[in-house]
Amino acid sequence: ERAPADGEKRFEIYVREKAILNLQHERAYSALNLAVTPEEQAPAATENEATDAKKKKPAKDKRKGSADEVALARQWMCQNFFDVRTFGAVMTTFVKSALNCGQVRGPVQLGFARSIDPIVPQEVTITRVAITTEKDAENKNTEIGRKYIIPYALYRVDGYVSANLARKVTGFSEDDLQYLWKAIINMFEYDHSAARGNMAVRELNVFKHDSELGNAPAYKLFDTIHVQKKDGVIAPRNYTDYDITVDESKIPEHVTCTRMI
């Protein structure tokens, strides 16, 4: 495997489906030629004793490097994994013989999405004309299933990007930020699902400050974005049933708002 050049970034993903995190930690130590020897343990005399020893093994008694080695491993993980340098990660899995790559506080933090108006999930009954087994086919011709959908909902989520943490901790760059915007805008285009229907990102408003620590509190900027139902709309069933506005008169100096969508 080719090692990245100084300053070169890679766009691997640390947390993936079925990924084994400790193997990624080992990659960091191997790439940096950091040899760490696990603590020696006395062999158990019997299988039962081995099981008991495993149960009594304290979580803190794990394979780990020195503080300098952990710092180097953490830097390697940030350089190679886009999600680590973006969102951060806890890379101390507290597993026997696991390598410690430290903890990273990511500069990008996203809150939980909430619907603008109350929603009610709808249960849909599905009839399957195929039968699972030959025995079932003797007694029935169809099988019934259920799926839950939401007829329509508009969600809002607030997020934060810390330029200070990006510079000091993970090396998250302006190029990385542009990739993040593209990912957010297109995240449902490559992951369509019958259960989610025509889900899409409708608005992406970005507030940019001209100083590293910001020129205004985030909540004041979020309060300038107003979402409300249009007159006469009782139960929204479409995006056009809402009015979405940004009160630019309340945005302070040295802060700009860009509508990405």
Each model region followed by its residue ranges:
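RNA-binding basic/glycine-rich loop and surface signature characteristic of RAMP-family CRISPR effectors
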Residues: 1-261
